[in-house]
């Protein structure tokens, strides 16, 4: 066990968890980024609720939200780190894992500050429905991100995180990767958004996305995809300005993404002049596997509450928001 406050030791152990040959594209990095983003993206500026404090996904009210489907894998991958460093809160661990993954996968260094505490019950868990719905367009994106205090430039910068990972039809309802190398942070998302011919496609679950089928692809190759919210970045004039800039200038994108993601990680956090968090209970809550699953990233037991077996018999898992 490390000494309390030894975040470098925690970082090293997070990096040791990144390589996962049997999971997705061989890396837990993208799901760590999504876990960090979803843990903070519930913030509401007007009511000052939600945000990265609390680790509310330990409770069914937040962890069982369809928008967070699949994130139990990220939480489970990080359990060995928590067991080795029990002094770190889940809220700090999940956000730190996101910024560590971004840098380890070739992205920019994101400023991260500790001090978050974990909720001791679910009384302060934010309501569901605050995360973006990827089936929507520009107006929806602005409604969600303006609520958190972001502007158009920051919205587009954060969307560049789609250069990592892929969608799963049993989680978000969409299917496929955005880019050819989904475990390497780059500005490729913006380049492909602008240059490829994206065609609408309706998936078996009735949800529509956009795909590019490479005429030179080999049999079995998975087509790249874009979400309706991604296409909105290209078609909305104000968003498009930043898409063009980031496609042309990787360094600018990295700089803006790092600043926007650091801001995201601080949503709902208030600090004093010494950077100590002053709006938390300073009590560390215990681990609760929510939805009610094991600590292993193998999925729920058959019929487990919060899992997908029942939904699958009724036409598939409920569509989650991204």
Curated annotation (Swiss-Prot):
Keyword Metal-binding: yes
InterPro entries, per database record: Ccp1-like, Haem_peroxidase, Haem_peroxidase_sf, Peroxidase_I, Peroxidases_AS, Peroxidases_heam-ligand_BS
Protein name: Putative heme-binding peroxidase
Protein family per UniProt: Belongs to the peroxidase family. Cytochrome c peroxidase subfamily.
EC number: 1.11.1.-
Cofactor(s) demanded: heme b
GO biological process: cellular response to oxidative stress; hydrogen peroxide catabolic process; response to reactive oxygen species
Cofactor remark from the record: Binds 1 heme b (iron(II)-protoporphyrin IX) group per subunit.
Active-site residues, Swiss-Prot/TrEMBL: 38 (proton acceptor), 178 (tryptophan radical intermediate)
Any one Gene Ontology molecular-function term assigned to this protein's record: metal ion binding
Catalytic class of the enzyme: oxidoreductase
Region Disordered, residue ranges: 288-322
SUPFAM superfamilies: Heme-dependent peroxidases (SSF48113)
Signal peptide: none
Residues binding heme b, per UniProt: 162
PANTHER family reported in the protein's UniProt record: L-ASCORBATE PEROXIDASE 3, THYLAKOID LUMENAL 29 KDA PROTEIN, CHLOROPLASTIC-RELATED
Job description of the protein: Destroys radicals which are normally produced within the cells and which are toxic to biological systems.
Keyword terms, alphabetized: Heme, Iron, Metal-binding, Oxidoreductase, Peroxidase
Site for Transition state stabilizer, residues: 34
